[in-house]
Amino acid sequence: MTVEEVFAKIKAHQIEGTMFQDQMRQYFDFLNLKGFKRMHEHHYKEESDSLVKTDSFYMRHANSFIPEYSVSTQSYIPQNWRSYRRQDVDATTKRRAVKDAMAKWVEWERQTKDLYSTSYKELLNDNAIDFAEFVKENLVLDVSEELAFAESLYMELENCDYDMVYLAEIQPDYSKKFKK
């Protein structure tokens, strides 16, 4: 793959990442889990900042726009939820929804790490060292940290079987941790 193709794939994935984080923010807001909502709001902003940084780096080093690449508009919120009201969601359904959302988040971060790691290797193989270093320093290392955090939270929630009391109790901690 050329540098242009690698960065086109990265940018498309970053755009998809902002959409993913925004949907998770909406989902947790709907579920009235304000700490998790704020956490994904924070990740949305980080994704947006990363996209701008990637664009700026490419523009400075390649002196051109990143080529366009197909962007998926997949919905991560179940379609039938669009007709629900908050009051329609009982504790069992909410528990299942949180479990599903956390699994999707971990999977998203794994896919992102795989893409960025593969991109790094392809750029190195193409002798595009400065582009490879950017991907490593700004994308691979960042997503590695986010994946470790997501997996840790996922395991924590799995260990308590997504207990609703526990979920409610930790929301203020996440609100505080990810305060603007």
Report each predicted region and the residues it spans.
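Iron-associated oxidoreductase/ferritin-like identity signal
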Residues: M1-K180
